[in-house]
Amino acid sequence: MSKFYKIWLVFDPRRVFVAQGVFLFLLAVLIHLILLSTPAFNWLTVATAKHGYVAAAQ
């Protein structure tokens, strides 16, 4: 474990951190979209039902 710092000689730290940030952002978006697609965890329809908002007429 004491020579773990040598991993940065193989990988460019800037690319690793950018790739990690992009991955985490896309993972967060994916999780939110999955939750919005389920009726129990869709906070938009739950809030609409709770406060009695009516959809705008078209």
Swiss-Prot record:
Q: Spell out where the chain crosses the membrane.
A: 16-36
Determine the domain of life of the protein's source: Bacteria
Question: What's this chain's function?
Answer: Antenna complexes are light-harvesting systems, which transfer the excitation energy to the reaction centers.
Gene name as annotated? pufA
Which family does the record claim for this protein? Belongs to the antenna complex alpha subunit family.
Q: Which GO terms describe its cellular component?
A: organelle inner membrane; plasma membrane; plasma membrane light-harvesting complex
The residues the record assigns to binding a bacteriochlorophyll are 32
The chain's Periplasmic topological domains, given as residue ranges, are: 37-58
> Any idea what this protein is called?
Light-harvesting protein B-870 alpha chain
InterPro entries, per this entry? Antenna_a/b, Antenna_alpha, Antenna_alpha_CS, Light-harvesting_complex
Q: How does it sit in the membrane?
A: Single-pass type II membrane protein
